[in-house]
Amino acid sequence: LQRSLNQELQRIDGYHRGNGGVSGGTIESAFSMRNYKSKYSMGHPFLLNSKEYIKTQNISENKDNFKIKYIDDIKLWSAPFVMAIANTRVVRRSSEIHDKNQASYGSEFKYQEYMMLKKYSSAFLVTAGLAVFGLMLISPISGLFRKLFTKAGNGPDKKTRENGWFESIFIGKNKNNEKYKLRMFCKGDPGYKSTAKLICESALCLALNSENLPNTNAGGVLTTSTGLGSTSVSYTHLTLPTRAQV
């Protein structure tokens, strides 16, 4: 997106929808987060960033957005996305590492993710459902609520994994308010088959193209973007059809 706009990015908003099963392991991780010990809570938008970087950022402008909104660029409604609390933190860590390697996304770069739905009523139900689930996670009797969901080690059957899918639309914007839209689609359960494809692509990237990977001296634990760079994009195009437009 940054190369397409040929300028620093001011922000990127990602919108997702799909169909698939529920992972018992993911549910278990969610309920275990209350035991996570850190100086910052899981709700901190820069949870994975350094103290020095956090001091330079506007925390309030990067907080998770739980509002329902009609998005004119895609003609759909947005709602909170359950994986945004993880994905956005990783992207912000990538942004910091790229800054240190003189490959900045943009000095005022912001990133958010949402679900996209056809109807306001659907967006409202998703928002309400996530709110209830969030209350279950922090409840004193969360252990009892945990029993209502899929057990760790269990997940969707083969038919569900094969018939699942996801679609993502990313809208990048620069300081001149020029926009660029990127659409991705993948067949296969988002949390299983589609994720397995991405893991395999990363493995191939490391095994076959190590000489083309970014030579980064900053970051410690790297993200996909900072560790694999544009080399991984060429592999992703093989399995995830993409379409872009200004």
Q: Model-found features: residue ranges?
A:
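Short, hydrophobic alpha-helical segments
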Residues: 2, 98, 199-211
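Active-site-lining helix/loop region of Rossmann-like oxidoreductase modules
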Residues: 2-152, 156-164, 168, 180
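Glycine-rich phosphate/pyrophosphate-binding loops
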Residues: 207-223
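Conserved small/polar residues in nucleotide/adenosyl-binding loops
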Residues: 235-242
